[in-house]
């Protein structure tokens, strides 16, 4: 399997020529007012706005409202002696300095409000602005770009180190030794999925209707899928072989994987306008700051979210879109035992005992018409064995191997299917002639008590290969 950096994966075969049916259309969707509020609530801006207006209402009440206050002094005593009502005078309810408390709160909340508006403006400016024609050209390049599915394995360990630090206690400084552990990378390996024997095709949707909306927020994602069981089995086998080859080289293993498109600047989000030189009024910077200064930023954001259409465009590559060329040599067997081996001891027992553990992928991807893989082998016999397996899984952190993503049923139930081995032998033919097709066992039973195809010392002569 070729190795290369995630950004430089070497040469890959060209995409399958455009001979596929018409693509499914995808249009931007404009949300309702309630949907826009649920999508982007801007609760921080709303909360700060409500607090500012509440404090402003308190300040206005302190300045405009009046409450009667009793008059103190000789005049009040004379009025009480004459039996009349006590004299009063109108006064502010927030006298004697109490007015400055809500003013201080208003000032602090307004500064926080402006900071939140600045962060919102910065986030909105991170998405580049462009027009519909540029986006359509970018999507065309994304559809034509060949994919690269890469893996990266980093072996590392921790080194115990010491350093001198200064601490302070009761005003006195003293030096002490601190022990810490630092990560040290010992080896880094990179690889990619070789799909030259299976082909690849772009099955992304066709984006239409961008020019029908004044503003559209476009979000890009990328993924890949498999159009045939052989392509998926090849991917899982190559991936498992790569990580198993890099396992055990050091104390720990960090595994990373991903996909990128070659020769294309992939952006996760774009802001599309019908005319970028004259965007809508709610998308202009001076309008945003003018309205924000008047503490009306939250209503403006609601209007902008309601007037902006949204679309999530997914670039999808389909592996196994074409049959392999006549002269193509497969990179490996259709399925390998590394796709199901889950610890090193089991791999060692399999190699020493010359036994092959049937894969879960074999149980599902093989149909009744896949008898071409089953070749005659008179020396093969079917047996159920658990003596060659370790008693339990080893403890400690370890890289989990890739398992097949094919579904075998929910809740631990098995689905009816054909459970056959690709190693050859009359097992499949006997099952068709004399016995009904049996369902695969649950995963734990197959892991600890697998069905083994045991070969003799001279190997299988039916397929012309030696013992595994």
Swiss-Prot record:
Knockout-associated phenotype: Knockout mice exhibited frequent spontaneous dyskinesia attacks.
Transmembrane segments annotated in the record for this chain: 45-65, 98-118
Keywords annotated in UniProt: Cell projection, Endoplasmic reticulum, Membrane, Transmembrane, Transmembrane helix
Tissue-level expression: Highly expressed in the central nervous system (CNS) including the cerebral cortex, hippocampus, spinal cord, brainstem, and thalamus. Expression is relatively low during postnatal stages but highly expressed at postnatal day 14 (P14), and declined in adulthood. Also expressed in the stomach, heart, liver, spleen, lung, kidney, and muscle.
GO cellular component: axon; dendrite; endoplasmic reticulum; endoplasmic reticulum membrane; membrane; T-tubule
Membrane protein topology class: Multi-pass membrane protein
Chief subcellular location: endoplasmic reticulum
InterPro entries membership: Tmem151 (IPR026767)
Location(s), subcellular: Endoplasmic reticulum membrane; Cell projection, Axon; Cell projection, Dendrite
Residue span of region Disordered: 1-20, 384-438
Domain of life: Eukaryota
Family, per entry: Belongs to the TMEM151 family.
Name the UniProt record assigns to this protein: Transmembrane protein 151A
High-level lineage: Eukaryota, Metazoa, Chordata, Craniata, Vertebrata
Gene, per the UniProt record: Tmem151a
């Amino acid at each position: 399997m070729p190795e290369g950096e995630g950004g430089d994966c070497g040469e890959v075969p060209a995409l399958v020529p455009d001979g596929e049916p018409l693509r499914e259309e995808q249009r931007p969707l404009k949300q309702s007012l309630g949907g826009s509020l649920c999508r982007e609530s801007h609760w921080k801006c709303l909360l700060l706005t409500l607090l500012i207006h509440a404090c402003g209402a308190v300040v206005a009440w302190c300045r405009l409202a009046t409450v009667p206050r009793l008059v103190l002094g000789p005049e009040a005593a004379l009025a009480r002696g004459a039996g009349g009502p006590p004299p009063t005078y109108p006064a502010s309810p927030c006298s004697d300095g109490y007015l400055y408390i809500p003013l201080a709160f208003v000032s602090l909340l307004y500064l926080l409000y402006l900071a939140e508006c600045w962060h919102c403006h910065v986030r909105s400016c991170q998405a580049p602005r462009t027009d519909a024609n540029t986006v359509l050209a970018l999507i065309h390049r994304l559809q034509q770009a060949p994919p690269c599915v890469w893996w990266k394995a980093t072996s590392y360990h921790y080194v115990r180190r010491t350093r001198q630090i200064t601490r302070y206690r009761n005003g006195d400084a003293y030096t002490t030794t601190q022990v810490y552990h630092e990560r040290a990378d010992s080896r880094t390996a990179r690889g990619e999925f070789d799909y030259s024997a299976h082909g690849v095709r772009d099955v992304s949707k066709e984006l239409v209707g961008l020019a029908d909306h004044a503003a559209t927020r476009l979000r890009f994602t990328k993924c890949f899928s498999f159009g045939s069981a052989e392509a998926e089995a090849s991917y899982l086998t190559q991936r498992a072989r790569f990580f198993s080859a890099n396992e055990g080289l050091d104390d720990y293993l960090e595994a990373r994987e991903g996909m990128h498109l070659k020769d294309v600047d992939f952006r996760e989000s774009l802001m599309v306008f019908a005319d970028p030189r004259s965007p809508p009024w709610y998308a202009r910077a001076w309008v945003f700051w003018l309205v924000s200064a008047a503490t009306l930023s939250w209503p403006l954001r609601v209007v902008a979210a309601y007037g902006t259409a949204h679309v999530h465009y997914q670039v999808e590559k389909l592996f196994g879109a074409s049959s392999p060329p006549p002269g193509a040599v497969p990179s490996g067997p259709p399925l390998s035992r590394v796709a199901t081996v889950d610890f090193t001891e089991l791999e060692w027992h399999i190699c020493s005992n010359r036994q092959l553990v049937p894969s879960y992928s074999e149980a599902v991807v093989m149909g009744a018409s896949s008898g071409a893989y089953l070749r005659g082998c008179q020396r093969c016999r079917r047996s159920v064995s658990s003596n060659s397996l370790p008693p339990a899984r080893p403890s400690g952190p370890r890289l989990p191997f890739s398992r097949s993503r094919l579904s075998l049923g929910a809740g631990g139930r098995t689905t009816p299917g054909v459970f056959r081995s690709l190693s050859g032998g009359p097992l499949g033919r006997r099952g068709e002639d004399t016995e009904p097709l049996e369902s695969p066992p649950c995963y734990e039973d197959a892991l600890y008590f697998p069905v083994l195809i045991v070969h003799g010392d001279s190997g299988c002569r039916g397929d012309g290969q030696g013992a595994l």
